[in-house]
């Protein structure tokens, strides 16, 4: 299982602690140092069954600085994927990628359901 986070993010810290309390093993990836590729994002979007917009960190400084709330609707999916792949700070975090699921953001009930 892959756990993507930004170490300074308090929500990521809570999610990490939650995983560790349950002895759930994962591979840790700093989303700022090693941002997802277009290929990974494409696969995760398909696996998640959610729209690509759910992968954007809409609360982030980068998202706001780039004016993405206004720009995203006019962008193609390929353009959105390319943009997400340029900067891990644009990606919603934490992101948990399992064999048959992807969860963005830490909502404990969703993670419990996904991890069975």
Question: Which role does the model predict for each range below?
Answer:
Residues 1-22, 26-31:
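Local sequence-structure signature of Cys/Sec-based thiol-disulfide redox active-site neighborhoods
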Residues 33-116:
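Thiol/selenol-based redox catalytic cores and closely related redox-interacting motifs
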């Amino acid at each position: 299982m892959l756990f993507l986070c930004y170490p300074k993010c308090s929500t990521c810290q809570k999610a990490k602690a939650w995983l560790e309390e349950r002895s759930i093993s994962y591979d840790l990836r700093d989303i700022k140092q090693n941002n997802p590729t277009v290929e990974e994002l494409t696969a995760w979007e398909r696996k998640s069954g959610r729209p690509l917009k759910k992968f954007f960190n809409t609360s982030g400084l980068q998202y706001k600085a780039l004016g993405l709330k206004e720009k995203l609707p006019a962008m193609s999916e390929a353009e959105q994927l390319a943009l997400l792949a340029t900067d891990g700070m644009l990606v919603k975090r934490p992101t948990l990628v399992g064999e048959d699921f992807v969860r963005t953001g830490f909502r404990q009930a969703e993670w419990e359901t996904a991890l069975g």
